[in-house]
Amino acid sequence: MEKTAKIYVAGHHGLVGSAIWNNLQQKGYTNLVGRSHKELDLLDGQAVKEFFDEEQPQYVILAAAHVGGIMANSLYRADFIYQNLQIQQNVIGESFRHNVKKLLFLGSTCIYPRDAGQPMKEEVLLTSPLEYTNEPYAIAKIAGLKMCESFNLQYGTNYIAVMPTNLYGPNDNSVS
């Protein structure tokens, strides 16, 4: 990426997004774009469309997600699947419509089966049941991964999906 390229970091106030934002700044990237949830509700497709129309990002890093600990994942299952699917649909969809050069989607290792052997191999994805407590979140993240893969295969886009391992650090807002 060029140092002056317009890079939209969705979720730039969160744990991963803020680390990416800070790293890009330290490396000299000067045209970073971020919006707080208050400024841009990623669940609102029209708002996301208007944002992309106005900003025209060249690169998108999708680190935004509805996250929580074990208790929240157990109690608010519908919220986790619905909100994460909506965020992904809106951001990946507008990235495609606006011809971004590259999109980086951050998933989660919870997409792998509950009883996957260690170390986990990519090939075990979708081979056996997920951990029940975070299954809706995991299914949404699998959908995001498959959206990226499908856009790449059908349209030749450059969408990359990565699955960070368990994370903690500054700006972590999950609650157990």
What is each stretch, according to the model?
Residues 45-85, 94-97:
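NAD(P)H-binding glycine-rich loop region in Rossmannoid oxidoreductase-like domains
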Residues 27-50:
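Adenosine-cofactor binding site in Rossmann-like domains, unifying the SAM/SAH pocket
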Residues 80-88, 99, 104, 140-141:
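Short alpha-helix in the Rossmann-fold core of NAD(P)-dependent oxidoreductases
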Residues 41, 111-113, 135-136, 157-176:
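Flexible, glycine-rich beta-alpha linker
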Residues 4-27:
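N-terminal Rossmann NAD(P)H-binding glycine-rich loop of SDR-like oxidoreductase domains
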Residues 10, 35, 60-66, 103-109, ...:
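SDR active-site strand-loop-helix element
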